[in-house]
Design a protein with these regions (language model features):
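Nucleic-acid endo/exonuclease domains
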Residues: 6-196
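Cys/His-enriched microdomains
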Residues: 3
Length: 196
């Protein structure tokens, strides 16, 4: 048993050492997922998530928010087609149109391998290629995101690219950009060419 000089000292030790152990992280992750499943955690949606949910509602696509997949939760699980939509905050998930690799914060740098691991896990164990709707696109061009979501759903998850920032509207039609940009979590990996 550990003895501490003060409450603050104990909290600092806990944050710096105890909570960084792999065993603790795995146990805590499972506890959080269970709490989500049992409805014990409040689900406060961000503005981009509300927009994504509105798109799915307008398209009459059934979905579940915050659906657990063992170690991860996904933003929108389209259960009738076994598909996933992830709502990607520009800051937290490092939108490459906004952030360069040289100017990332420590928080952003730590987020990239987590996004990479989640992407690989869902592809490997569930065979799902996620559609990534980025915050900027949801807020500035919701119609593009709606067309992309519709195409993703009705083509059973088959798209030429899975990131909303790689599309534009041309005469009201969804069009893939000539220059494809990869999110940070797919750069320098074998899946970049296949999954980007």
């Amino acid at each position: 048993m550990n003895t501490f000089c003060s409450k603050k000292c104990r909290q600092e030790w806990y944050a710096k050492y105890w909570s960084q152990r792999d065993e603790w992280r795995d146990k805590n992750r499972k506890k959080i997922l269970k709490a989500f499943q049992e409805g014990k955690m409040s689900n406060i949606n961000t503005i981009p998530q509300v927009i994504a949910n509105d798109i799915l509602d307008r398209l009459d696509i059934p979905y579940l928010n915050e659906q657990p997949f063992v170690y991860y939760t996904v933003d929108n699980y389209l259960y009738e087609h076994n598909l996933i939509i992830e709502v990607m905050g520009d800051y937290w998930h490092v939108n490459p149109l906004i952030f360069s690799n040289k100017k990332l914060t420590e928080v952003q740098r730590k987020r990239i391998p987590k996004d990479k691991a989640k992407h690989k896990y869902l592809a490997k164990y569930y065979g799902i290629e996620c559609l990534y709707l980025w915050e900027h696109d949801l807020e500035k061009n919701a119609y593009l995101c709606e067309l992309l979501t519709e195409q993703y759903y009705f083509n059973d998850g088959k798209l030429p690219n899975y990131n909303s920032f790689n599309y534009h509207l041309e005469d009201g039609r969804l069009t893939l950009n000539d220059e494809i940009i990869y999110p940070m979590f797919l750069i320098d990996s074998n899946e970049t060419k296949e999954a980007g």
